[in-house]
Design a protein with these regions (language model features):
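Short proline/glycine-enriched turn/loop motifs at strand-loop junctions of beta-rich domains
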Residues: 108-114
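Short, surface-exposed coil-to-beta transition loops
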Residues: 54-59, 99-102, 128-129, 160
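Long, terminal "pre-/pro-" and other extracytoplasmic accessory regions
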Residues: 101, 106-107, 118-123
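Extracellular ectodomain segments of secreted/surface proteins
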Residues: 78-103
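Sec-dependent bacterial lipoprotein signal peptides
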Residues: 1-15
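Ser/Thr-rich low-complexity repeats and stalk/linker segments
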Residues: 115-179
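N-terminal export/targeting and maturation segments
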Residues: 18-83, 159, 174-176
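Short amphipathic beta-strand and strand-loop transition segments with alternating hydrophobic
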Residues: 33-38, 90-95, 131
Length: 179
């Protein structure tokens, strides 16, 4: 019996606190109920909202090993957003260790958004542009530029302007943003 307890303790220590579903892993870290809106398995990133109010949109990473999920609130990013004019459109461009450059965001609209096109234009050379087309699910998105071109959000906006357009199923522009 003692050997069995020792074996179980070693398994727990080696695997850490892992869960059968990502929802269970995230919920374990949050007091409020969360609603997962988008899971990107290739680079193990996720976007969710903070429960019944869906006010705060949160982006983070997770780990999946042996069919089990681990989630840490470090380095979580959460934002609330609104707009006085047009469709509220959140777009964030960040760099994460082990993942690289990431573009993520959300739109608050009843219109089904299917794609976001993001264009970065170099401030010193306007002909130098990087365009990223990102599929949208549940009006949220996670995308990755094909090449790494910044180290931090601060350095990005010192060198690049950002513009983005969100499109519906018919190809109509639902929202746009220029930063």
């Amino acid at each position: 019996m003692r050997n069995l307890k020792l074996f179980l303790c070693m398994i727990l220590l080696l695997t850490g606190c892992s869960y059968k579903t990502l929802n269970e892993a995230v919920q374990h870290k949050w007091k409020e109920p969360v609603k997962i809106l988008y899971i990107e398995n290739k680079k193990q990133t996720v976007i969710f909202t903070d429960g019944p109010t869906d006010v705060q949109y949160v982006f983070s990473t997770f780990e999946k090993e042996h069919g089990r999920y681990k989630y840490s609130t470090d380095p979580e990013e959460g934002y609330t957003f609104d707009s006085e004019v047009g469709v509220p459109f959140l777009i964030r461009t960040i760099n994460r260790e082990k993942v690289g450059n990431i573009i993520w965001g959300a739109l608050k609209t009843n219109i089904k958004v299917v794609r976001v096109n993001v264009v970065y234009t170099n401030k010193n050379n306007p002909d130098d542009q990087i365009e990223v087309q990102i599929p949208v699910k549940n009006n949220v998105f996670i995308g990755y530029p094909t090449s790494s071109f910044f180290d931090s959000e601060t350095s990005l906006f010192q060198e690049w302007n950002l513009s983005a357009k969100a499109y519906d199923e018919d190809g109509n522009v639902v929202a746009n943003i220029n930063i």
